[in-house]
Amino acid sequence: GLGDVYKRQGALVSFLGETGSFYRVSPVSIEGEWWVPRRYVKLLSDSTQFNHVVVVDRGDQNIATLERLEEGTWAIRSMNPATTGMHRPPYAQETPLGMFVVQQKKSRMVFLKDGSAATGGYAPYASRFTNGAYIHGVPVNVPRTAMIEYSWSLGTTPRSHMCVRNATSHAKFVYDWAPTERSLVIVIE
C-alpha cells in the first residue's frame, strides 16, 4: 500500500469534502488526495486571496517578496540574502520545501539553548510558516539584548535550526507586510 504520508503543519491544501471526522484534501505541492482528521486542518474562507508571497530559495540562500497588484500582475517588493536550516540532528534541520501559509507572528521569538531548558536568546520579527520554522531577523544570543541588523553569513550556507534568517530590517518588513493566514511562503531548492 501507499503507507502513511505526512505533510508539514501549515502546508497549503485544497479542501475537497468531508466525511465524519475527516476532511478530504489535496496538497498543493504534491499530487494526490488524502483523508485527514479534522483536527489537523484549519479551513480558510473560500474567498481567501494570497496577495503576499515570500519565496525562499534554499539553493541560493536568498529570499524575495512578491505582491499581487491585480489579477496577473505581481510586483517584486524585496530581494535579500538569507540563511536557511542546516542538517544537524537532533536540534537543527533543513528548512522544509513546499508551500505554506503564514500562521503566526512574534515580535520576539524566544529560543532555547540546544539540549537545554535555558533561554538562548531571541529572534526578532518572527513570522511562523510551519511547525518551528519562522522567517526572522538575526538572532540575539543571551546575555546580549539589543537587536543586530546584519550577519556576514547571510546568503552563504545553511546555518539556522530550520528557520529563514535574514537582515533584521527585512524581517521587520515581512512581519509588517505579510498578513497572517493571507500570505504564502514558498520554499524552493
Predicted regions located by residue number:
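Short, small-residue-biased leader/transition segments that mark boundaries at the very start
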Residues: L2-Y6
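SH3/SH3-like beta-barrel superfamily modules
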Residues: K7-R39
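Extracellular/periplasmic catalytic domains that process cell-envelope and extracellular macromolecules
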Residues: K7-R8, L16-E18, S45-Q49, V56-R58, ...
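Solvent-exposed, polar/charged alpha-helical surfaces in well-ordered, non-transmembrane soluble domains
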Residues: R8-A11, Q61, S169-D176
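Solvent-exposed coil/turn segments that connect beta secondary-structure elements
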Residues: E18-G20, V28-I30, V41, G59-Q61, ...
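A structural motif detector for short, solvent-exposed N-terminal "entry" segments of globular domains
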Residues: V36-P89
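Exported/periplasmic cell-wall-interacting domains
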Residues: T95-L97, M109-E189
